[in-house]
Amino acid sequence: KIIWRCNDKYKHEPHCQTPHVTEEEIRVRFVEAFNRLLGMKEQVIADCRIARETLRDCSSLEREIADLRKEQQRVAELARIAILEHVSVAEDGVNTLQEEYLAKHDSLAQQIIRLEAECRRRVEKCDLIAKFIRTLAKQETVIDVFDEKLFMAVVKHITIGRDGSTGFHMINGTML
């Protein structure tokens, strides 16, 4: 008999008070939750398609990245000029200016990395939702027994309340 408990049960004092649940209880509750999801199938799929369109459109992020790259090039050129001037005129103020330009350049690079990561995250989420849509769309009838492949394809994670209630967080953001 497999029993599941809170991932953080013993992490803090007092210990987590959520009850243990058996794998069989989770399986039965998933079948019920998935069948409720099927009752909303058309609306859920329509909502998922809208979400995918929104996620897929990274044009504003791409414009922001392009603007940051231009600014980065401008700052790099200013740093280069400051370095050349520093060679011909040894002044402490020029060295500080170089450092400011380099710090600004590094800051812009970090912003670009963050925005590119956000674009990738959105594309990955879009792909997951597409898989979720395909899985839900091909499910014609309610399920009577637990299907592990189906479970893995649609569930992101599960929460168990202190009262023993179960929340299935689906990949598309729906919570049942």
PLM ranges: what are they?
Residues 1-176:
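Amphipathic alpha-helical coiled-coil/heptad-repeat segments
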